[in-house]
């Protein structure tokens, strides 16, 4: 799954420039019901600005409340350490950054440094749904020993009993025993028959 196929392209984004006031940033976020927006100008990506960051800054720095939101520019408080990825990177890399960097999006920048778009948490959830084939077919969850041939054995049972595999995911349950959970989405009119054959073959059904 390439990033370019799931990113929100730059021409569909609402952005703000580094020299704009933080009041303008707040107004844009309020108007569009956003929690954060990218900071960019032309093809250059600078970072992100969020409501939380603005409010925290304002209440820490303006205790006398005499200063105004118009007194400060976006570049003075924006987050500049937003991770970037290439359009041809895999979505797994974007998911990793979103998890470990605590950001609302990952910026997509090409090899020339041109800002192309962003990858959001929503995009990751969508790809996760597609990967697992949710809302498609029937779900079969099997506990199998981590030994060679188990996957081949399962798929053979399914195909021999008029089943079509939509998706196949192997999950490590982090247990003390050497087993894996295999989650399969199957398109079939013989689901019960497949269940029985899987059980007869020694697999445990979850």
Label each PLM-derived region with a short phrase.
Residues 16-18, 35-49, 85-86, 104-119:
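Cytosolic beta-strand hydrophobic patch enriched in CBS
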Residues 29:
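OB-fold/S1-family RNA-binding modules
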Residues 176-182:
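A short, glycine/Asx- and small/polar-enriched loop/turn
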Residues 1-12, 50-86, 90-100, 111, ...:
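Tandem CBS (Bateman) regulatory domains
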């Amino acid at each position: 799954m390439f990033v370019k196929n799931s990113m929100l392209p730059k021409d569909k984004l609402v952005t703000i420039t580094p020299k704009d006031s933080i009041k303008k940033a707040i107004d844009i976020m309020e108007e569009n019901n956003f929690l954060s927006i990218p900071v960019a100008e032309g093809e250059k990506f600078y970072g992100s600005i969020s409501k939380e960051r603005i409010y925290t800054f304002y209440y820490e720095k303006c205790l006398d409340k005499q200063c105004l939101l118009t007194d400060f520019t976006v570049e003075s408080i924006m987050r500049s350490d937003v991770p970037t990825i290439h359009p041809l990177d895999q979505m797994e890399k974007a998911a990793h950054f979103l998890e470990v960097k605590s950001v609302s999006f990952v910026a997509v920048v090409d090899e020339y440094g041109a800002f192309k778009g962003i990858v959001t948490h929503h995009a990751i959830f969508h790809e996760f749904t597609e990967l697992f084939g949710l809302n498609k077919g029937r779900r079969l969850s099997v506990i199998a020993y981590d030994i060679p041939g188990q996957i081949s054995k399962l798929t053979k049972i399914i195909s021999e009993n008029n089943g079509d595999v939509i998706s196949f995911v192997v999950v490590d349950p982090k247990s003390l025993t050497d087993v894996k959970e295999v989650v399969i989405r199957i398109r079939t009119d013989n689901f019960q028959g497949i269940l029985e054959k899987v059980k007869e073959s020694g697999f445990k059904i979850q």
